Amino acid sequence: MPENVAPRTGPPAGAAGAAGGRGKSAYQDRDKPAQIRFSNISAAKAVADAIRTSLGPKGMDKMIQDGKGDVTITNDGATILKQMQVLHPAARMLVELSKAQDIEAGDGTTSVVIIAGSLLDSCTKLLQKGIHPTIISESFQKALEKGIEILTDMSRPEELSDRETLLNSAATSLNSKVVSQYSSLLSPMSVDAVMKVIDPATATSVDLRDIKIVKKLGGTIDDCELVEGLVLTQKVANSGITRVEKAKIGLIQFCLSAPKTDMDNQIVVSDYVQMDRVLREERAYILNLVKQIKKTGCNVLLIQKSILRDALSDLALHFLNKMKIMVVKDIEREDIEFICKTIGTKPVAHVDQFTADMLGSAELAEEVSLNGSGKLIKITGCASPGKTVTIVVRGSNKLVIEEAERSIHDALCVIRCLVKKRALIAGGGAPEIELALRLTEYSRTLSGMESYCIRAFADAMEVIPSTLAENAGLNPISTVTELRNRHAQGEKTTGINVRKGGISNILEEQVVQPLLVSVSALTLATETVRSILKIDDVVNTR
């Protein structure tokens, strides 16, 4: 008998069939679903463990190098996972989980994966004790519903007019980032940016596309600024005109150059007279285009980038210069919507449609020099009602600028969360410890397996304070025990003060986060864990 064929020990196939549903013979491979489940759980836990060290203000950063050799330095959970090449399908679910949290709340992308990892760890212990996955799944759903109630009880309502609270929320988000030392500059900038694009009285959400982040290499993060208006990184094409007051701005999508034939034709010019006629015709054609533009009163012209041919010929530039029209070319197609919303202009595809009512207006359009590190074009004092702002991010190198942009995006998302759901909750691991405590009490009111599973869910919540303490160099066991004790005495807002390296009332330290971040993290993590639990087989298809 060959070695790789295991000897059959059970009854022959016919006997198994005859036995019908009796005994274990109806379904031989009972271990496979359990093995698949444990394989999925361990793969997903490996992802959670990979980013555990980057949680909190004292968390470490990751350096990620992609296949092309580009390097990213970050401690944003969503960015780390997005760039990791995860192959296991269950582990990929955690990457998607982090992405979902980034879309929903924008912050808490690391926490949500760590909570999911901890819940999966609890599942392993429950499964090993022989509890059925469906019972675990239903109990976790019950625990989640109770958990959201507990978090909502802990939260306090906030008004958008309370600027101090908004600043504290943005600062808490920025404190765990690489750019944390600049949070005193970036927090007010993020709050002002969001407040300028919404009406605080009626807003229920924020469209972050109204806040454009422009990256410009050079300077330091201290040079970042918020501009009410439009900032373009392109250069002014005609160097003579760099400042225009009372600007009338046109945006064209056609080319200011000699027309090309639709088909590939050749024209043979045999003598100088014909050559002269061709040049004269070209000159007259371009001059006519420029005159039509000037006739509308336009004095700043933005030209969309053309990939087919030169969008702006030297001759056209010469005429525009003579007519004192400032020209900015190579405007990207994706920027056009934002430009139109900001300055109230309309894009024009043909010169015949270029009329005065297509123009936008602004108080000032000028090219600004950035202390030797290039130039920017600023268009300010826009008359149009479009509520948009631009944040200019500066930095000494590409890595710093990109991380600063991600950090500002997270801070903007935190303010957006407060606009969506106007309630705040303490940070520093306080809500998680309170959850663990109250869910444990709740589990005592239940009986049977359900009580046991909810108790395991409660214990899993302690991973956040434990990780925060570990990353801050504190003893996780004594810190979590002390926290439990203080919360049992009714101190709901006691959490880990990472800056001072101890335990204190977190609200007094102004460490706060939107309720939506915590609720979203708990909901999404539980849903993902329940999905992974229900999987008992992985089938590969071609």
Curated annotation (Swiss-Prot):
User: Main role?
Assistant: Component of the chaperonin-containing T-complex (TRiC), a molecular chaperone complex that assists the folding of actin, tubulin and other proteins upon ATP hydrolysis. The TRiC complex mediates the folding of WRAP53/TCAB1, thereby regulating telomere maintenance. As part of the TRiC complex may play a role in the assembly of BBSome, a complex involved in ciliogenesis regulating transports vesicles to the cilia.
Q: How does it assemble?
A: Component of the chaperonin-containing T-complex (TRiC), a hexadecamer composed of two identical back-to-back stacked rings enclosing a protein folding chamber. Each ring is made up of eight different subunits: TCP1/CCT1, CCT2, CCT3, CCT4, CCT5, CCT6A/CCT6, CCT7, CCT8. Interacts with PACRG. Interacts with DNAAF4. Interacts with DLEC1.
The UniProt family comment states: Belongs to the TCP-1 chaperonin family.
Q: Does the keyword Transcription regulation apply?
A: no
**Annotated residues for binding of Mg(2+):** D107
Mainly localized where? cytoplasm
Residues where ATP binds:
G56, G108, T109, K177
Q: Which GO terms describe its biological process?
A: protein folding
Keywords recorded for this protein, A-Z? Acetylation, ATP-binding, Cell projection, Chaperone, Cilium, Cytoplasm, Cytoskeleton, Hydrolase, Magnesium, Metal-binding, Methylation, Nucleotide-binding, Phosphoprotein
Q: What is its EC number?
A: 3.6.1.-
Q: Which residues carry this modification: Omega-N-methylarginine?
A: R22
Source domain of life: Eukaryota
One example of the protein's molecular function in GO is: ATP-dependent protein folding chaperone
Q: Which gene encodes it?
A: CCT4
**Record-given protein name:** T-complex protein 1 subunit delta
For the modification Phosphoserine, the affected residues are S39, S187, S205, S447
Listed Low complexity bias regions: 1-16
Cellular component (GO) terms are: centrosome; chaperonin-containing T-complex; cilium; melanosome
- Annotated region Disordered: where? 1-31
Reaction equation(s) it catalyzes: ATP + H2O = ADP + phosphate + H(+)
Enzyme class (EC, first level): hydrolase
